[in-house]
Design a protein with these regions (language model features):
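Basic, polyanion-binding surface patches
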Residues: 1-191
Length: 191
């Protein structure tokens, strides 16, 4: 297989596109974020990268935020939240989001999203064009119909990713390739 040398870029398959929520000037605001991920499993922490000029970043000053995982059926609303600024548009009203709160009053959550994480800011790293916000997950809410045997089911959640590289489109998950920590046994066992 021939390889070509490309310019340095973070060409890692992105995790799901999420809607990051903050309270800005007393009102809930959401923005679409593609650069996010799991930062730690214990304590549970997630990371989101937000451009310095984004309005949502003002709400991070409250030291609380939410990560809402939208399903494929609200891709238009999610995309809209990445196209317009909350400084100019009430995205909650425009998208008809039903907002609720858990114990963190500065971490607005979206009812229409099957998974919601309420987070407290643990660290903020200045990286260049973005700030990396590390948040400790305080609460996790999952829509009951998106569970199978009491566990979140990706086929029911229907997350989607932001396609990077030659295309900038959203993609849903495809078929299963095999069971984790099992399919590799065809090569050998764990030591």
């Amino acid at each position: 297989m021939k390889k070509i040398l490309a310019a340095p870029q973070p060409l890692i398959c992105t995790p799901p596109t999420v809607l990051v929520g903050t309270m800005v000037d007393g009102k809930p605001n959401f923005m679409a974020v593609a650069w996010c991920g799991v930062a730690c499993s214990n304590p549970p922490m997630v990371s989101v990268a937000i451009r310095l000029a984004r309005y949502t970043l003002k709400g991070i000053q409250n030291r609380e935020f939410s990560v809402n995982i939208p399903s494929a059926d609200i891709v238009k609303e999610t995309d809209y939240c990445g196209m317009v600024s909350g400084a100019e548009v009430d995205k909650v009203a425009a998208c008809k989001f039903d907002v609720f709160y858990g114990q963190l009053t500065n971490a607005p959550l979206i009812e229409q999203c099957p998974v919601n994480l309420a987070c407290k800011v643990a660290h903020i790293l200045n990286l260049g064009t973005h700030q990396l916000i590390i948040g400790q997950v305080i609460e996790t809410h999952v829509t009951e119909s998106c569970l199978t045997d009491g566990k979140p089911d990706l086929n029911k959640i229907q997350p989607f990713v932001y396609g990077m590289g030659s295309t900038t489109e959203y993609y849903t998950l495809g078929k299963s390739l095999g069971k984790c920590f099992s399919v590799g046994r065809e090569i050998g066992t764990r030591k």
